A protein has these predicted regions:
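Structural beta-sheet core signal
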Residues: 12-14, 56, 105
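Residues in the short beta-alpha loop(s) of Rossmann-like NAD(P)-binding domains
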Residues: 34, 41, 58-62
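A short, N-terminal amphipathic alpha-helix
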Residues: 36-54, 75
Length: 165
């Protein structure tokens, strides 16, 4: 599993922010007595992908920094801090820093993202030379998406308000 992702320069990004207008501090909400929403997602990804390139991709906002640094250290995953509102720029900057051609988008509020779907999507994404790959065959909360760096760079120019991504 890991070899295919590595050979094709595909990284797994957990896209998350500590603050939310709808549910404040949702990333730190405890699922059980021991772990929070973000940790559950990391544990699921690490179980299937071992020490593969899993990155928490979040914003530079002050209350994000300490929270995610602690989790990154605890779980030995990279943490990338980028623009708060321009998520596409944050992702592009992270991909370029890590020398990736594609990334799997796993959102921080979808702790049940299906790791096996990631591999199937990745294979189809590469085989079909897609810029974007998704699935409708899974319930909400389980769906990963895959984007190419080339596709993001091409389409970022078409976005009217980059602060709403």
């Amino acid at each position: 599993m890991n070899n295919f992702l590595k050979e094709n320069k595909i990284g797994i990004f957990i896209i998350t922010r500590y603050n939310s207008k709808r549910l404040r501090q949702k990333a730190s909400i405890k699922i059980s007595n021991q772990i929070n929403l973000t940790e559950l997602l990391i544990e699921r990804m690490k179980y299937y992908f071992n020490n593969f390139d899993i990155t928490i991709c979040t914003s530079k906002r002050n209350n994000n920094i300490n929270f995610y640094k602690k989790i990154g250290t605890k779980y030995e995953v990279d943490v990338f801090f980028g623009p708060e509102k321009n998520m596409i720029k944050r992702v592009i900057d992270c991909m370029e820093k890590k020398n990736l051609k594609h990334f799997v988008r796993v959102t921080g509020d979808n702790p049940m993202t299906d790791p096996l779907a990631i591999l199937n999507l990745a294979k189809n994404h590469i085989k079909n030379k897609n810029e974007y790959t998704y699935t409708d065959s899974l319930p909400h909360g389980m769906k990963p998406e895959i984007f190419s760096l080339a596709g993001l760079k091409k389409n970022i120019k078409k976005i009217v308000n980059l602060n709403s991504t």
